[in-house]
Amino acid sequence: ILDNRIEKISNCFKQASEEYGYKAENFIIYPIKVNQMRPVVEEMINHGKKFNLGLEAGSKPELHAVIGVNTDPGSLVVCNGYKDESFIELALLAQKMGKRIFLVVEKLNELNLIAKMAKQLKVKPNIGIRIKLASSGSGKWEESGGDASKFGLTSSELLEALDFLEKKDMKDCLK
């Protein structure tokens, strides 16, 4: 079932990419909070290799679990959720060990922590930014988007983040 679903998601995205001329590389990311059982995660990883499957960790315990799983060196690990110094340190140490870690900034203060820890550990972090769109979608999750969303940076915070990265000579870390 898992193999079939990974393949179906990949094929649907490939078809949509061709239809709309989307050329960028894409990845399927499995949030391990869905099911943290090692056999399930390993099955996702093993079958997902040919589909650029990566893992998402939304907490420090999840990040420990992700680091402990044998993934491909090119496989993405996306770090979302609340990030304190110890979470960021663990993520950056995993990056130094060869994991392909991306820290997704959801609050402006996280950038300071990432910059501080990266400097201490002498590592160039991979940074993503979650933005809070002014408009919201429709359907079940309509109220969790737009200005009412509790996650992501506003457009003015995004500009502050870009200024911060430029001043810290870290603009190239934004992926």
Over which residues does each language-model region extend?
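N-terminal hydrophobic targeting/anchoring segments and the immediately downstream early-domain regions
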Residues: 1-13
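Surface-exposed helix-capping loop/turn segments at secondary-structure junctions
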Residues: 13-22
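Active-site-proximal beta-alpha core segment in soluble small-molecule metabolic enzymes
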Residues: 21, 26-175
